[in-house]
């Protein structure tokens, strides 16, 4: 009877429940379900057994388009030249999104919208009708900043052409040059487009001259647009259709699919962005990874339109997403550049070459503010690293700050963006050390070792005798700026141990200059000083150059002659004196007074570079004495003095977590 009542309540409540939340009551016997796959799409929070009419119409249109009418392209530009705004206009033009209400649709991260920059390469599929025929266009909005070069390089692998976008008011900038050569090296068809031609400060003729002289590109058919107002934007897509070649692929061959990117979804798990080179992929198929050898069943396939839109199939030439059911158990299984094929064809299909692993150039240590939150921080880092494989992570421990991570990034902006994402997307409260660069130790035995953690630097006299030399990384920096700031830029580069490589004028008033600089100086706010010295008109790009021998030392902070491991850096000897004085002065501000004297020192080996002293609290031991009792007065003062000596010898300085947090804050 009780079971019937429960069943009656459940049936009466069923119409008010969402379809996906329906569950049989516990009084029902358990059944064995046949695990078979279908192309039915499961949406979390609701059930969708049949596609909507809009989805069916979209799928029919895509199915009718042959690979010869596919176009995969990206937008190449310097940061802030209008890539994301132009992407919005193209999406509106093709009816992918509604017009008038969008701003940087493909900038999906909070940090991207706050900073006004693109951090992650985002993709979107569009259908464009040209001369009575549908074309399937796949657009990639790439980052412009040098720190996200790995994102740009991966994006180019899925494209056949690129829009070379140049701000008509600023002209060719440093990262325009760098991104151009990256696209040119991959054989992409380049289409020059001038943006912001509606601005009063725009000079299209000068910008076209710079493009022609710098890149040797025919600018006669360059398109001049204003992405903000939509001026002449309809002329862009016909140029893309005519100039960008169709992708090469065969849907009848066995599946050959490249993993381009991945991200984490709290419901679906790891989602993969893929480019299908041959064959086709559907829900229910079993795939195998060439890198790991692991097998997975496909749960769903689809395209970004501009959000995840499920499809029945992805064909050769398409770029889309897939996720597995059951999903990947560990985020590390998603190897960027991996090739997937169907189980049984792994000996027939040749794996694709993949991508070159980017090298970390800047390292920081990250610790949770509260030691109890270490596991939460670890989970948060793993989820973000899944979406950015250029980051390296190693666990480490500090006596002062507890368990944490040593993390490597491609640059200081890359590090700063990751820090913002940790705080905003995962609510992490963290302490992060200032960025440092790796050094190479060449031993007298001939062996070489890359040191990324200052704690492992050979500083002891006995170990130092075995070292032949210590080398630091140099980078080749490309600077573009107006001619009037030439003197200030040269002065800044020379002050940072730079060596001039070349200087040329690509117009009468614009200079391109190349310098070799130590990477350690570049990450020490060099770009901020450059912007300040040129009133914001200079731009910068850099690439790896070489390792050079130098007088590299380890600077440590000592508190009562005990080293504080959380405040240690490897640097050139020329920086030591200035940095040491900054450290001791700043650290003194954040350490509480004790009953004994606290000595704060900056040291290189046994040599003290700078010192500050925090005086102890003073206790008036003479308060109860008569003024005439001189011998008693002297005896009590001597006793107090001896007591302070003992305290200083055995007393442990208590430095609170918040002191480190304040000291390490930017």
From Swiss-Prot:
One of its GO terms (cellular component) is mitochondrial matrix. One of its GO terms (biological process) is translation. Residues 1-44 form a transit peptide. Residues 68-248 form the tr-type G domain. Keywords: GTP-binding, Hydrolase, Membrane, Mitochondrion, Mitochondrion inner membrane, Nucleotide-binding, Protein biosynthesis, Transit peptide. Its EC number is 3.6.5.-. Pfam families: EFG_C, GTP_EFTU, LepA_C. SUPFAM superfamilies: EF-G C-terminal domain-like (SSF54980), P-loop containing nucleoside triphosphate hydrolases (SSF52540), Translation proteins (SSF50447). It is a peripheral membrane protein. GTP binds at residues 77-84, 141-145, 195-198. It catalyses: GTP + H2O = GDP + phosphate + H(+). Promotes mitochondrial protein synthesis. May act as a fidelity factor of the translation reaction, by catalyzing a one-codon backward translocation of tRNAs on improperly translocated ribosomes. Binds to mitochondrial ribosomes in a GTP-dependent manner. Belongs to the TRAFAC class translation factor GTPase superfamily. Classic translation factor GTPase family. LepA subfamily. This is Translation factor guf1, mitochondrial. The lineage of its organism: Eukaryota, Fungi, Dikarya, Ascomycota, Pezizomycotina.
């Amino acid at each position: 009877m009780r079971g019937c009542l429960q069943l009656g309540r459940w049936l009466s409540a069923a119409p008010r429940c969402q379809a996906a939340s329906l569950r049989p009551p516990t009084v029902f016997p358990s059944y064995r379900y046949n695990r078979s796959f279908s192309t039915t799409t499961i949406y979390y929070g609701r059930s969708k057994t049949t596609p909507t009419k809009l989805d069916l119409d979209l799928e029919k249109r895509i199915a009718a388009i042959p690979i010869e009418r596919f176009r995969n392209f990206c937008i190449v530009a310097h940061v802030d030249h209008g890539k994301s705004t132009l992407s919005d206009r193209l999406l509106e033009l093709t009816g992918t999104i509604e017009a008038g209400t969008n701003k940087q649709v493909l900038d999906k991260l909070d940090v991207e919208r706050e900073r006004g920059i693109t951090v992650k390469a985002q993709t979107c599929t569009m259908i464009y009708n040209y001369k009575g025929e549908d074309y399937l266009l796949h657009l990639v909005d790439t980052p412009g900043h040098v720190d996200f070069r790995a994102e740009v390089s991966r994006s180019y692998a899925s494209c056949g052409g690129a829009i070379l976008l140049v701000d008509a008011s600023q002209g060719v900038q440093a990262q325009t040059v760098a991104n151009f050569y990256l696209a040119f090296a991959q054989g992409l068809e380049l289409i020059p487009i001038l943006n912001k031609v509606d601005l009063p400060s725009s000079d299209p003729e000068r910008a076209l001259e710079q493009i022609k002289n710098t890149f040797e590109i025919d600018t006669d058919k360059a398109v001049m647009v204003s992405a903000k107002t939509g001026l002449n934007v309809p002329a862009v897509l016909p140029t893309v259709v005519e100039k960008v070649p169709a992708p090469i692929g065969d849907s009848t061959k066995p599946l050959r699919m490249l993993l381009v990117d991945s991200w984490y979804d709290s419901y679906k798990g790891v989602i993969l962005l893929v480019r299908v080179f041959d064959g086709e992929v559907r829900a229910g198929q079993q795939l195998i990874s060439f890198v790991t050898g692991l097998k997975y069943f496909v749960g769903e396939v689809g395209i970004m339109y501009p959000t995840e839109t499920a499809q029945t199939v992805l064909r050769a030439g398409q770029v889309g997403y897939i996720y597995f059911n059951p999903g990947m158990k560990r985020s590390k299984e998603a190897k960027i550049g991996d090739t997937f094929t169907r189980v049984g064809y792994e000996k027939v299909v040749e794996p694709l070459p993949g991508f070159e692993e980017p090298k970390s150039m800047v390292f920081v240590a990250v610790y949770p503010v509260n030691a109890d939150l270490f596991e939460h921080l670890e989970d948060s880092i793993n989820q973000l690293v899944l979406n950015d494989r250029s980051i390296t992570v190693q666990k480490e421990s500090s006596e002062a700050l507890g368990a944490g991570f040593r993390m490597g990034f491609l640059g200081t902006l890359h590090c700063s963006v990751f820090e913002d994402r940790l705080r905003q997307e995962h609510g992490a409260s963290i302490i992060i050390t200032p960025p440092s660069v790796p050094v190479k130790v060449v031993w007298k035995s001939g062996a070489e070792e890359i040191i990324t953690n200052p704690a492992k630097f050979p500083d002891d006299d006995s170990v130092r005798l075995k070292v032949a030399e210590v080398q630091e990384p140099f980078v080749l920096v490309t600077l573009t700026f107006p001619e009037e700031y030439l003197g200030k830029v040269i002065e800044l580069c020379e002050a940072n141990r730079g060596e001039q490589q070349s200087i040329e004028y690509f117009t009468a008033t614009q200079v391109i200059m190349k310098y070799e600089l130590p990477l350690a100086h570049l990450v020490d706010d060099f770009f901020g000083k450059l912007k300040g010295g040129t009133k914001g008109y200079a731009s910068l790009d850099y690439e790896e150059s070489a390792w050079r021998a130098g007088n590299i030392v380890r600077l440590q902070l000592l508190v009562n002659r005990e080293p504080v491991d959380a405040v240690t850096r490897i640097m050139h000897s020329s920086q030591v004196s200035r940095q040491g004085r900054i450290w001791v002065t700043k650290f003194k501000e954040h350490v509480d007074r004790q009953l004994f004297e606290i000595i704060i020192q900056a040291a290189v080996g046994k040599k003290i570079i700078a010192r500050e002293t925090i005086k102890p609290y003073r206790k008036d031991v003479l308060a109860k004495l008569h003024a005439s009792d001189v011998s008693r007065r002297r005896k009590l003062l001597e006793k107090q003095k001896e007591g302070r000596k003992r305290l200083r010898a055995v007393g442990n300085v208590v430095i609170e977590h918040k002191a480190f947090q304040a000291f390490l804050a930017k």
